[in-house]
A protein has these predicted regions:
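Non-globular, low-confidence helical/coil segments that flank catalytic cores
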Residues: 1-248
Length: 248
């Protein structure tokens, strides 16, 4: 996937996609979904209108039957965003805006919207849709590129965000995963999606050290490629062992 985000969630024959990678990754995401047997996406969430999250979304929206498309109520003055809007129009899709506290079902699992909690002007990252997914005893937290200010707003909305698995915000940037937020999530596992040798230096050492100090097991796409977690509601298994190098 490189320096971008895409997460596929499958449960009881239902599928959900959170983000779709960068502009040049749409076909890669499409091929992965098809390889996984996906024909219909019950939910597509574009966390925020930055290219590394919605770049491939026009391809996904065009190629798959998409039921509910959730994106924040903010526009971005970019060709990438325009491509998504145009594809939505061409397919007759409507945007569902996220409402904090609303819960949706996906098979036997469910997810709750936890962000955005207010309007953030032109700060696209802070508009990120946050989702807490629950399958049986397992909880997974996804916050897009939400940064520290948006994390504070999540902490103040009263929703319990403790989770077994935390998809680390903003590719492991030190502008996110504040100590207070990490303490509230208290994850056992963390997944960092970042491009190998990316120019941003993601994930940042401060975040890795914060996770290490909290005893969290970390998985990294820049070192390990596609990471798969399987939950039956009681047992959680992974397609590989946690990264070792992050402990440097």
């Amino acid at each position: 996937m490189g320096q971008g985000d895409a997460t596929l969630i499958k449960c009881d024959g239902h599928s959900m996609l959170i983000d779709a990678g960068n502009n040049d990754k749409g076909t890669l995401v499409q091929n992965y979904l098809q390889h996984q047997g996906v024909e219909t996406l019950d939910y597509v969430i574009g966390t925020h209108p930055d290219a590394d999250h919605i770049g491939g979304m026009d391809v996904v929206l065009y190629k798959f039957d998409c039921k509910t498309i959730i994106m924040p109520d903010v526009a971005n003055n970019t060709r990438t965003y325009d491509d998504v809007v145009q594809t939505m129009k061409n397919k007759g899709y409507k945007t569902t805006y996220p409402v904090v506290g609303e819960t949706y079902t996906i098979g036997g699992a469910a997810f709750t919207i936890i962000a955005p909690n207010k309007e953030y002007g032109n700060d696209m990252n802070s508009w990120s849709v946050g989702v807490l997914l629950q399958n049986g005893n397992h909880r997974f937290l996804f916050t897009g590129d939400a940064e520290e200010g948006a994390e504070q707003d999540i902490l103040q909305n009263g929703i319990d965000i403790s989770a077994d698995v935390y998809k680390v915000a903003h590719h492991g940037s030190n502008t996110a995963t504040s100590q207070a937020f990490l303490d509230a999530v208290h994850p056992t596992y963390a997944v960092i999606s970042a491009g190998e040798g990316n120019s941003y230096g993601h994930p940042h050492a401060e975040v890795l050290n914060r996770l290490r100090a909290a005893g969290v097991s970390v998985f990294r796409t820049d070192e390990q490629g596609t990471i798969v977690a399987a939950s039956d509601g009681t047992t959680l298994t992974w397609n590989m062992s946690p990264s070792e190098s992050w402990q440097a």
